[in-house]
């Protein structure tokens, strides 16, 4: 994560970096409204074939790694946003539409296609796996 962040900062030279995290119980609010929320999604595929930890151990390890990463980011010129019962997607949507950032060029870095809907004249989506930008000017398609 830190290596990718460093590379993107070198290439994009941002004025400000905001990282959004899922808050505790982030999807609970949506699940209360729609019990089928996130049903049928494929489990996250790990980038390794050998499983040395149980699923519970992997989750604990993921939480520990995220906590350590957040601690390290506290020493960097990065703004981190997280709120209980709020998903990172909602935070990103709020920030891109916030009057505070009106007139700014905003780049969302994610492989999540749902962010296409946030693309406008000021907001583009960078899909790191494809290494391509998507923008409203091109109908949400990658450039």
Report the location of each language-model feature.
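Noncatalytic, basic helical substrate-engagement surface that gates or grips nucleic-acid strands
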Residues: 1-109, 115-134
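A short, charged helix-loop
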Residues: 131-143
């Amino acid at each position: 994560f830190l290596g990718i962040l460093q590379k993107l900062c070198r290439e994009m030279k941002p004025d400000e970096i905001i990282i959004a995290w899922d808050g505790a119980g982030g999807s609970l609010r949506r699940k209360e409204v729609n019990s089928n929320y996130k049903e049928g999604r494929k489990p996250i595929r790990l980038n390794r074939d050998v499983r040395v930890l149980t699923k519970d151990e992997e989750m604990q390890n993921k939480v520990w790694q995220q906590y350590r990463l957040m601690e390290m980011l506290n020493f960097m010129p990065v703004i981190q946003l997280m709120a209980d019962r709020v998903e990172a997607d909602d935070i990103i949507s709020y920030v891109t539409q916030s009057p505070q950032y009106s007139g700014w060029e905003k780049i969302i870095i994610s492989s999540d296609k749902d962010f296409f809907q946030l693309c406008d004249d000021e907001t583009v989506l960078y899909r790191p796996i494809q290494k391509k930008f998507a923008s409203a000017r091109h109908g949400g398609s990658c450039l």
